[in-house]
Swiss-Prot record:
GO terms for molecular function: DNA binding; site-specific DNA-methyltransferase (adenine-specific) activity. Belongs to the N(4)/N(6)-methyltransferase family. Disulfide bonds: none annotated. Its EC number is 2.1.1.72. InterPro entries: DNA_methylase_N6_adenine_CS (IPR002052), MeTrfase_D12 (IPR012327), SAM-dependent_MTases_sf (IPR029063). This is Type II methyltransferase M2.HphI. The keyword S-adenosyl-L-methionine applies. It holds the Pfam family MethyltransfD12. Coiled coil: none annotated. Both this methylase and M1.HphI protect DNA from cleavage by HphI. Keywords: DNA-binding, Methyltransferase, Restriction system, S-adenosyl-L-methionine, Transferase. It comes from Haemophilus parahaemolyticus.
Length: 336
């Protein structure tokens, strides 16, 4: 294990910049950590680097594929032959062509996506498939203005016009018009080099957190739920990728933590599910609801010891003129 580096994973709310800080707060007797809203897997990746046994879970299937590729996977990489095979077929009409032509991508690009997916599914190894889908995630997002699938087609076309982009923003953003294959190959080495073995057997799940916590065992649970009052529509941002992988239009999930009025109830439900675990680590920020005082009160019931740490954190939100500067909170709970 030669100091593997977390690859480029565009993910709103990614904890890459503070993953080290969070891991440093883990109690010394922790050996197994469950990352139950794993998202872009930056925390899970850092925990794996530090030798922990990791359980990664996310309700989005594309995030589950990231966890399979980067956390559970200990050795499988994509070879040059694998990549040549993935891109060996001419474009073909299929699910993406039928449902998403001139919605997020041009029709011919959707035909390319259909051909690529068909070949990825022919790879005879789960981890190779996961790596390929992780790289296709990167490619599709690189071609998408603002890196999220909540932009109207008219805006997509406008922002992919390099002359318009240059006149408006001083940058052509030519990468939006590079091919899927170009982006896939450009990022191949960094994703392959992120595959490593820390000596442990890891697990990945694609479940609702409230179901997951009933059947896993871990010394500590790390929670990074969507923050209410922020850009937190993760199904809207990335649900298209789940539809692409499955070949069927996916529906938004329940228990999404987006509704301020529902958030307190969901946290109460979550705390109830966490009772079997010794340590809880909860990431949140200083502008969301429940607020710091409300969360502290909920978490400290029944004699639980709660410590709250904070660090400045800048959220890079694509499509926003100003980066959002908030204070990142980390609630450390010892369930005594």
């Amino acid at each position: 294990m030669n100091n593997p580096k977390y690859p480029k994973v565009n993910y709103i709310g990614n904890k890459e910049k503070i993953a080290e800080w969070i891991c440093e707060q883990l109690p010394v007797d922790v050996r197994t950590i469950a990352d139950v809203f794993s998202g872009g897997c930056s925390f899970s990746f850092e925990a794996k680097k530090r030798g922990y046994q990791v359980i990664a879970n996310d309700i989005l299937n594309i995030n589950y594929q990231l966890a399979l590729a980067l956390i559970v996977n200990n050795q499988e990489i994509l070879t040059a032959c694998d990549v040549d095979f993935i891109f060996s077929n001419p474009p073909k009409s299929g699910f993406m062509t039928k449902n998403y032509s001139d919605v997020f991508f041009f029709k011919e690009e959707c035909r390319e996506l259909d051909a690529i997916r068909a070949n990825i599914l022919k790879l005879n190894n789960t981890y190779k498939q996961a790596l390929a889908f992780a790289l296709m995630r990167r490619a599709m997002i690189r071609k998408m203005p603002y890196s999220r699938f909540t932009i109207s087609w008219e805006k997509v076309k406008q922002l992919r016009d390099e002359e318009y982009s240059y006149s408006k923003y001083g940058r052509r953003r030519a990468y939006h018009n590079q091919s899927f294959e170009f982006h896939f190959r450009e990022n191949l080495n960094s994703y392959n080099q992120a595959v490593f073995n820390n000596g442990n057997i890891h697990q990945a799940y694609n479940e609702d957190v409230f179901e997951l916590l009933d059947h896993i065992q871990a010394d500590a649970v790390y929670l990074d739920p969507p923050y209410t009052g922020t850009m937190n529509n993760y199904f809207g941002f990335y649900g298209l990728l789940d539809s692409y992988m499955s070949g069927e239009i996916r529906q938004p999930f329940d228990n999404h933590f987006m509704d301020k009025n529902q958030a307190v109830e969901l946290f109460e439900k979550l705390i109830e599910k966490l009772k079997p675990f010794k340590y809880w680590l909860l990431s949140y920020n200083n502008v969301s609801r429940p607020n710091r005082e409300e969360l502290t009160a909920m978490l400290s019931r029944n004699g639980r010891k709660v410590t709250v740490l904070e660090t400045p954190h800048v959220y890079k939100v694509t499509g926003k003129e100003n980066k959002q500067k908030h204070t990142e909170l980390l609630f450390l709970v010892e369930n005594r």
